[in-house]
């Protein structure tokens, strides 16, 4: 595995590290929790690390901060969607995780699913919803239950499970309050799984799969972050063959999107054993309830060791020519 226990990383080699957290998305609260954990981990290893909140500090302050690299612990819009990545490209500051295009693609569930379908990767059938959509026709085509959610939000924010056609309008309006694009996808009845990933391209690898057992099968925002009632099984309890199949599917999905550094694929395992990709998170949570640190621990990698390796892999899409000058 490219990520290991006890990596030999000199904290001085990382230079001055900025941890971007908070931000302006609906996931701000979770980002603050993730970033605080990352910041503490880096500082505990002797890294010159500093927190930076783009919601309260300006671009000029970011440019003047003198960061040699940054750990992006932002979730959702303005941090996980390619916008912050593009800014850091302009500033020439290496950053963790996927680049501009992969981040933007993964943030948009519609674009992600279309790309996966093009590569014959299994993902639930879906339809885009608008105010003038014939919801009855969507239900007739996709069947019930349906999952209705904003195309560009995370942490289950704005998500509804529709079990009757009469619920479609309310579910649409809930999601549309957060995003102009709303997606309805076929509900997959089965086991909820997640698979963290590290590396890039040919070196991309999957960490152990985690099985999620939420109260009443409702893994919503509250049950993700603020209760202890949700069970996380790692080892997952899946057979070695099924776990390997889920990991291989997740790696393919990661590569197709062009992800790098680290990410987390959410997967549903249907009762007949067929896995379906739901979405790719390119800036996963790093809170006390988060899943990537749990999978890393199962692979023998501590939270601090994992963070050190993520930040050591910080890079840019484009590497500026230091000798270039405008004519």
Curated annotation (Swiss-Prot):
Cofactor(s) demanded: Mg(2+); Mn(2+)
Positions annotated to bind Mg(2+) 2: 279, 281
Gene Ontology MF: a single term: ATP binding
Cofactor binding, per record: Binds 2 magnesium or manganese ions per subunit.
Catalytic activity: 2 D-alanine + ATP = D-alanyl-D-alanine + ADP + phosphate + H(+)
Domain ATP-grasp, first and last residues per copy: 113-312
Pathway(s) where this gene product acts: Cell wall biogenesis; peptidoglycan biosynthesis
Principal EC category: ligase
Keyword flag Kinase: no
Pfam family, one: Dala_Dala_lig_N
UniProt keywords, alphabetically: ATP-binding, Cell shape, Cell wall biogenesis/degradation, Cytoplasm, Ligase, Magnesium, Manganese, Metal-binding, Nucleotide-binding, Peptidoglycan synthesis
GO BP term, pick one: cell wall organization
Positions with a binding annotation for ATP: 139-194
Keyword Transport on entry: no
GO CC annotation: cytosol
InterPro entries, alphabetized: ATP-grasp (IPR011761), ATP_grasp_subdomain_1 (IPR013815), D-Ala_lig_Van_CS (IPR000291), D_ala_D_ala (IPR005905), Dala_Dala_lig_C (IPR011095), Dala_Dala_lig_N (IPR011127), PreATP-grasp_dom_sf (IPR016185)
Record function comment: Cell wall formation.
Family indicated by similarity: Belongs to the D-alanine--D-alanine ligase family.
Protein name per the record: D-alanine--D-alanine ligase
Protein's organism: Cupriavidus pinatubonensis (strain JMP 134 / LMG 1197) (Cupriavidus necator (strain JMP 134))
């Amino acid at each position: 595995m490219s990520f290991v226990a006890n990596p030999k990383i000199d904290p001085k080699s990382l230079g001055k590290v900025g941890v971007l957290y908070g931000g302006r998305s609906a996931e701000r609260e979770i980002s603050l929790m993730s970033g605080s954990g990352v910041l503490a981990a880096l500082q505990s290893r002797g890294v010159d690390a500093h927190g930076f909140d783009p919601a309260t500090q300006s671009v000029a302050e970011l440019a003047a901060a003198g960061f040699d690299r940054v750990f992006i612990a932002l979730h959702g819009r303005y941090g996980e969607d390619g916008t912050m990545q593009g800014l850091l490209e302009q500033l020439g500051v290496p950053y963790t995780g996927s680049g501009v295009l992969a981040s933007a693609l993964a943030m948009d569930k519609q674009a992600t699913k279309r790309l996966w379908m093009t590569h014959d990767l299994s993902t639930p059938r879906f339809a885009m919803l608008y105010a003038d959509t014939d919801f009855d026709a969507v239900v007739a085509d996709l069947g019930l239950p349906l999952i209705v959610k904003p195309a560009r939000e995370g942490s289950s924010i704005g998500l509804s499970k529709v079990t009757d056609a009469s619920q479609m309008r309310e579910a649409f309006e809930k999601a549309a309050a957060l995003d102009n694009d709303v997606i309805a996808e076929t509900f997959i009845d089965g086991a909820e799984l997640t698979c963290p990933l590290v590396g890039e391209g040919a070196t991309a690898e999957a960490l152990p799969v985690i099985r999620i057992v939420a109260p009443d099968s409702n893994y919503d925002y509250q049950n993700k972050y603020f209760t202890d009632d949700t069970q996380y099984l790692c080892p997952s309890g899946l057979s070695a063959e099924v776990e390997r199949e889920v990991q291989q599917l997740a790696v393919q999905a990661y590569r197709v999107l062009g992800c790098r550094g680290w990410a987390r694929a959410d997967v549903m395992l249907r009762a007949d054993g067929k896995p379906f990709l739901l979405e790719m998170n390119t800036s996963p949570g790093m809170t006390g309830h988060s899943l990537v640190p749990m999978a890393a621990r199962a692979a023998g990698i501590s939270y601090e060791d994992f963070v050190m390796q993520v930040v050591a892999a910080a890079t840019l899409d484009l590497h500026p020519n230091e000798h270039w000058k405008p004519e």
